[in-house]
Amino acid sequence: MSIGNIVQCIGAVVDIEFPRDAMPKVYDALVLEEGNDKSFAEKGLTFEVQQQLGDGVVRTIALGSSDGLRRGMSVMSTGAPISVPVGHGTLGRIMDVLGRPIDEAGPIEADEKRAIHQKAPKFDELSPSVDLLETGIKVIDLVCPFAKGGKVGLFGGAGVGKTVNMMELINNIAKQHSGLSVFAGVGERTREGNDFYHEMKDSNVLDKVAMVFGQMNEPPGNRLRVALTGLTMAERFRDEGRDILFFVDNIYRYTLAGTEVSALLGRMPSAVGYQPTLAEEMGKLQERITSTKTGSITSIQAVYVPADDLTDPSPATTFLHLDSTVVLSRDIAALGIYPAVDPLDSTSRQLDPQVVGTEHYEVARRVQQTLQRYKELRDIIAILGMDELSPEDKLAVSRARKIQRFLSQPFHVAEVFTGSPGKYVPLKETIRGFKMLVDGECDHLPEQAFYMVGSIDEAFEKAKKLQ
């Protein structure tokens, strides 16, 4: 337990000098000593060692506000990395990056503490899965189905519905799924964390969820490490042989926190100002989110896309690690079609006839072909109008517009705003509905009948009312 002194403080990055023979190791946790009186610095502020500069000086990130720090303050080395409580004591609780409770419900009684930096499971321990995870959301189940124990990314710019989609997935999967969930709020709005907590509480599944938050207002050190804290809790449940759901909102803020810290640590920036270690940091996190022979982690991650540019280094690096990508499009949101999932841009490794079956695969591909044809004809329609199209093309456009509307769906979590009850559509119903559409069995129905309904039977009922 060596003691050092602060020698320099620049924002969240603090240099601390220790005796040369007692320098802390990289990733060790250091704690601000209590005896630093007359300072309004955070009590028990934790630092994480990032670099050893030599001569006994280490460069650290403060995991908390660095306000009130000054040179000469004494800091104690703990001799170990940051460790957080794991296990059943964390369920139903809200914690910060260090695993401290922030829900004012007393201390967390955990049977074990684990370091947040762990190695990814070995290759021979991994267990690939091909079982489908039904979400009840038509467009996702049809075009980009999820795998149990797979990794899913929800990509979208600002305000196209990533968080609402994630809340609906939590509503449909976490409530039906009898297992445990871990939610990591990384650099998002505190209001959304609050909404999530109340959503879980009202539906009586709070005792199956562990929540870890490092929100927008927190220093970059917290936002950088909070994803690892949540993941460490999920890994413990997985190692017990359970099937875990791990939600992260938002992976982009994890990258952004890394960028802020990287600049303060004096590293040379790479493309678009990102940290040079972007791929490594993302890989370290994503390779740990995996299913082993003992248990599985199914992870659903929201990914903010800066300026709607999917080629930006941050979303582009995230793409590499995922099994399914759900791309939300501003153009579709502008048409009033929610969820605003782009069925032509979204992909899934599960969409394979050997996994989902021939019928599902063929229906999904025919739906995509019809929508693609409509996309190609849109310019001609804009210039010359519908009358100039051949009868086959007119039919394709008519079907595509119906398919486009049938891909919309009322959400349970949006009932409060829309006033229409949410719909959960089983996979068989989804396939049956879209098969009828592409086979031309619904050509006589008006396209309004397909907007914001659940199954195809509801569309027929709505059509009767419209006549």
From Swiss-Prot:
Report the locations given in the UniProt record: Cell inner membrane
Q: Which domain of life is it from?
A: Bacteria
Family designation: Belongs to the ATPase alpha/beta chains family.
A Gene Ontology cellular-component term = plasma membrane
The record ties this protein, via Pfam families, to: ATP-synt_ab, ATP-synt_ab_N, ATP-synt_VA_C
Official protein name in the record: ATP synthase subunit beta
Annotated GO MF terms: ATP binding; ATP hydrolysis activity; proton-transporting ATP synthase activity, rotational mechanism
Classification via InterPro entries: AAA+_ATPase, ATP-synt_VA_C, ATP_synth_F1_bsu, ATPase_a/bsu_AS, ATPase_alpha/beta_chains, ATPase_F1/V1/A1_a/bsu_N, ATPase_F1/V1/A1_a/bsu_N_sf, ATPase_F1/V1/A1_a/bsu_nucl-bd
Q: How does it sit in the membrane?
A: Peripheral membrane protein
Please explain the role this protein plays, according to its UniProt record: Produces ATP from ADP in the presence of a proton gradient across the membrane. The catalytic sites are hosted primarily by the beta subunits.
**UniProt xrefs under SUPFAM superfamilies:** C-terminal domain of alpha and beta subunits of F1 ATP synthase (SSF47917), N-terminal domain of alpha and beta subunits of F1 ATP synthase (SSF50615), P-loop containing nucleoside triphosphate hydrolases (SSF52540)
Listed PANTHER family: ATP SYNTHASE, ATP SYNTHASE SUBUNIT BETA, MITOCHONDRIAL
How this chain assembles, per its entry, is: F-type ATPases have 2 components, CF(1) - the catalytic core - and CF(0) - the membrane proton channel. CF(1) has five subunits: alpha(3), beta(3), gamma(1), delta(1), epsilon(1). CF(0) has three main subunits: a(1), b(2) and c(9-12). The alpha and beta chains form an alternating ring which encloses part of the gamma chain. CF(1) is attached to CF(0) by a central stalk formed by the gamma and epsilon chains, while a peripheral stalk is formed by the delta and b chains.
What reaction is this protein's catalytic activity? ATP + H2O + 4 H(+)(in) = ADP + phosphate + 5 H(+)(out)
Could you say which enzyme class this protein belongs to? translocase
Q: CDD domains per the record?
A: ATP-synt_F1_beta_C, ATP-synt_F1_beta_N, F1-ATPase_beta_CD
Q: Where does ATP bind?
A: 156-163
EC number in record:
7.1.2.2
Keywords in alphabetical order, please: ATP synthesis, ATP-binding, Cell inner membrane, Cell membrane, CF(1), Hydrogen ion transport, Ion transport, Membrane, Nucleotide-binding, Translocase, Transport
